[in-house]
From Swiss-Prot:
Keywords: Activator, Developmental protein, DNA-binding, Metal-binding, Nucleus, Repeat, Transcription, Transcription regulation, Zinc, Zinc-finger. InterPro entries: Ikaros_C2H2-ZF, Znf_C2H2_sf, Znf_C2H2_type. Its main location: nucleus. Pfam families: zf-C2H2. This is DNA-binding protein Ikaros. It comes from Oncorhynchus mykiss. Binds and activates the enhancer (delta-A element) of the CD3-delta gene. Functions in the specification and the maturation of the T-lymphocyte. Also interacts with a critical control element in the TDT (terminal deoxynucleotidyltransferase) promoter as well as with the promoters for other genes expressed during early stages of B- and T-cell development. Function is isoform-specific and is modulated by dominant-negative inactive isoforms. One of its GO terms (cellular component) is nucleus. PANTHER family: C2H2-TYPE DOMAIN-CONTAINING PROTEIN, ZINC FINGER PROTEIN. The keyword Signal does not apply. It is found in: Nucleus. Residues 1-48, 96-115, 379-406 are annotated as: Disordered. GO terms for molecular function: DNA binding; DNA-binding transcription factor activity; RNA polymerase II cis-regulatory region sequence-specific DNA binding; zinc ion binding.
Length: 522
């Protein structure tokens, strides 16, 4: 068999082939067969042996050229795969070549490949450490870096290291300030594609995610989940969730029908939603919320840490109170008896208002409940003025929902509850009948009577002074603004949890000490 191949190789064009009579003349001579094809060129034989050795050398050189060409192709493919390491989809998905060897071929050594994984029957690779299945050796190589801790791509400006080149390129945009993703409807720009897709939803008309208890709508499911965690956990603690569920459900159904009528024939929302889905390269399960850059480089650290942190805490609490209540509603509430000409207007706008004869007999608990309802109405008036979405440069995915959820930072849970109960007033429509409103008012009064005790504050002249009491800390405030700032420091899940840094105290003494010292860690 080797002789026939040698003869065929010797008859290639450009080579001298022996004449046919030479074969018949030298049949009687012994024909040596070389044991090592690579060393056959060094053997000195007769004319026939030299030509056969030359043919064998040609065959060996052809095989070496094929192997060298295959190795060069694999090296070039390896360099290209290294450059495309950030895009895991550009790979050799067939699994035909793994470092120059074929799966199941004579050069492969069992089920293991040189990439450090286990070759599966379908051509994929399985990690030998955690068992994850990868579609190719490049994916497995990037995955192995999570086990070894290798981060070959390093930023030259700050020294941050990454496992993939795409993450490094995204990080470099932080230094350059480049924001390639821009909104075509406003001046908003961001660095991430998923942030742009979330911003495009702020331009859409509808809010598909609606709360089944209070009727509030959100554009993102994550905002709805946060709302349920804040609002309805508090309702369950107060025992009011079942009592107001039926009332608010009817109101939410009416609002739903009204929104459906307003959105019929509107194609803009559908186009924006499709555009947001097409722009998003990957799904954002939990949208990022940009809190803001904290720059401490210009601060002189001559004072103690408590002195440096305290102004920041006060500013944050004041901003939270202003964002929730608005500048108009932060003024102290002074009850004045309405004139006879205003009684008709007051009766139509505020059915819960009591006549002057009954107003003198109201206790402090009744007036506190009325103040809560008035605060909710003042909040609804201020929220209608700020209806347009914010198009700032922050990477926020749901600006309107974030502004609505800031309500939980600036005031107590009871005010937050009242704002949800009177959602019809906030929308400018009062669909509830008088009996349902009376039921809400009685529920509010009952909750206040259970949670609070009667008190009376007198001035130096003996006149009664309006006071606001924190039920958690048992502190009286003569100023409504200071009371609102203080209530903004309490958490919703736990009243003794700091709403600024999340520190949980055992009792009111530890909570007051924590707020006084200003030891907030972010």
């Amino acid at each position: 068999m080797e002789m026939e191949e040698a003869q065929e190789m010797s008859q290639m064009p450009g080579r001298d082939s022996p004449p046919p009579n030479d074969v018949s003349e030298e049949n009687d001579e012994a024909m040596p067969i070389p044991e090592d094809l690579s060393a056959s060129s060094n053997l000195q034989h007769n004319n026939r042996g030299d030509k056969e050795g030359l043919a064998c050398n040609i065959k060996v050189e052809a095989r070496c050229d094929e192997e060298n060409g295959l190795a060069i192709d694999m090296m070039m493919n390896g360099e290209e795969e290294e450059e495309c390491a950030e895009d895991l989809r550009v790979l050799d998905a067939s699994g035909a070549k793994v470092n120059g060897s074929h799966a199941g071929g004579p050069d492969s050594k069992g089920p293991y490949s040189s990439a450090g994984g286990i070759r599966l029957p379908n051509g994929k690779l399985k990690c030998d450490i955690c068992g994850i299945v990868c579609i190719g050796p490049n994916v497995l190589m990037v995955h192995k870096r999570s086990h070894t801790g290798e981060r070959p791509f390093q930023c030259t400006q700050c020294g941050a290291s990454f496992t993939q080149k795409g993450n490094l390129l995204r990080h470099i945009k932080l230094h350059s300030g480049e924001k390639p993703f821009k909104c075509h409807l406003c001046n908003y720009a961001c660095r991430r594609r998923d942030a742009l897709s979330g911003h495009l939803r702020t331009h859409s008309v509808g809010k598909p995610h609606k709360c089944a208890y209070c009727g509030r709508s959100y554009k993102q499911r994550s905002s709805l989940e946060e709302h349920k965690e804040r609002c309805h956990n508090y309702l369950q603690c107060m025992g009011l969730q079942n009592s107001i569920y039926t009332v608010v459900k009817e109101e939410s159904n009416q609002n739903e029908q009204r929104e459906d009528l307003s959105q019929m024939g509107s194609k803009r929302a559908l186009v924006l939603d499709r555009l947001a889905n097409n722009v998003a390269k990957r799904k954002s399960t939990m949208p990022q919320k940009f809190v803001g850059e904290k720059r401490f480089s210009n601060i002189s650290f001559e004072g103690g840490p408590g002195e440096l942190m305290q102004p920041h805490v006060i500013d944050q609490a004041i901003n939270s109170a202003i964002n929730y209540l608005g500048a108009e509603s932060l003024r102290p509430l002074i009850q004045t008896s309405p004139t006879s000409s205003d009684m008709g207007v007051m009766g139509s706008m505020y059915p819960l208002h009591k006549p002057p004869a009954e107003g003198h007999g109201l206790s402090a608990k009744d007036s506190a409940a009325e103040n809560l309802l008035l605060l909710a109405k003042s909040k609804s008036a201020s929220s209608e003025k700020d209806g347009s979405p914010s198009h700032s440069g922050q990477d926020s995915t749901d600006t309107e929902s974030n502004n609505e959820e800031k309500a939980g930072v600036g005031a107590s849970g009871l005010i937050y509850l009242t704002n949800h109960i009177t959602s019809g007033v906030r929308n400018g429509v009062l669909p509830l009948v008088k009996e349902e409103q009376q039921r809400q008012y009685e529920a509010m009064r009952a909750s206040i009577e259970i949670a609070s005790e009667g008190f009376k504050v007198l001035s130096g002249e003996g006149e009664q002074v309006r006071a606001y009491r924190c039920e958690h800390c048992r502190i009286l405030f003569l100023d409504h603004v200071m009371y609102t700032i203080h209530m903004g420091c309490h958490g919703f899940r736990d009243p003794f949890e700091c709403n600024l840094c999340g520190h949980r105290s055992q009792d009111r003494y530890e909570f007051s000490s924590h707020m006084t010292r200003g030891e907030h860690r972010y």
